[in-house]
Amino acid sequence: MDKRVFTAFLMAFIIALASCSMIPLAFAKLDSSRPPDIEQVIFIHFVKSKAKPPSEETGYYKLIGAKWQTFPVNLEVNPSSSGLSQDFVIKAIGMAAEEWDSGAYSQLEGIAWYGVAPDLFNDIIAITDKGYDDLAWTSDKLDGCNTIVWGNYPTGGVIAVTILWYNKATKTIIEFDIVLDTDYEWDNATQGLTVMDLQNIVTHELGHGIGLGDVYQSTAYQETMYGYSYAGETSKRDLYIGDKKGITKLYGAA
């Protein structure tokens, strides 16, 4: 077999292995009558212009009351409608996911942080053809896949939306889906301050997907989980004090 053909075949095989459809789905294909222990949370990420930085903070975080129990968490993405190349999208999402795994192994405000104990996210991100209407807006759309797509959310001023489902009895996250709004231009904001930075926003949304809520204190503006963003922002790419405290509270330190 030609080396290039073999390489292409191998990559396709690896992507197929990463597909969430191969994961046992305890809660897949639920009907429209929501099971009593299954709860939905929708996080809406609004745009807000950059404000003057307030005084320093010591680390805000908010837990939603559920977390993943099995790892790694698989991701899939449909890069169509993004206006970006598939390679760029995969790389940006991969870097966002890795930030929650390792947080760049930093020393910050006297806190030595070396990531969390489990390897949270699968390093391989699958490609899907699912769209906005295929996401788990209702329980009958649950499929065990954590899907990222671009779409037009009906409310103005919304950058992204994360839909999360969890089991109230076991406090276990079942699935999350992310919509990145097509009202905005997406790219690398270090090369253009008028765009929404893909890595920046996805890092925030993945925080919801693994169990963290938004924080809105004015002094929490440096946190990845601060609930507002703006075009050109890149600070959410890097976890801050509260983000690291929160994720360590959920999953333990490495």
Language model segments and positions:
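Alpha-helical segments with a strong preference for the paired helices of cellulosomal dockerin domains
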Residues: D87-E98, I241-K245
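Secretory targeting signatures
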Residues: M1-A28
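Short acidic/polar beta-strand-loop edge motifs in secreted extracellular
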Residues: L84-S85, V89, S235
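A broad, low-specificity signal marking well-ordered, structured residues that form hydrophobic/aromatic
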Residues: V73-L75, N146, I178, E223
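Metalloprotease/metallohydrolase-associated module, dominated by Zn2+-dependent proteases
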Residues: C20, L25, K29, Y166-A189, ...
